[in-house]
Amino acid sequence: MKVYCYSKCTTCKKALKWLDENKIKYELIDIKEDHPDEKTLKILHKKSGLPLRRFFNTSGLIYREMELSKKLPNMSEDEMFKLLASDGMIVKRPLLVADDKVLVGFKEEEWKTLLR
């Protein structure tokens, strides 16, 4: 299992603490330094079953600076994937990848359900 996180993100810290407390092994990947590429994002999106917009870090500085809330509705999926792949800080985190399961963000109940 892989977990894409940003070390300064409090939500990521909570997620990692939860994984550790539940003795769940994972590979930690720094989303800022080693973010998923476009091909990987397409696979993760398909596995997640979520709308692509859920993969965007809507509370992030880059999201706000680029005014993505206004731009995303007019973007194609290909454009969105390219944008997500361009900078890990645009991607919602933590991003958990476990075989055929993908979780975006940390909601303890969702993680409990999928990982137990």
Where are these regions (language model features)?
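Thiol/selenol-based redox catalytic cores and closely related redox-interacting motifs
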Residues: 33-114
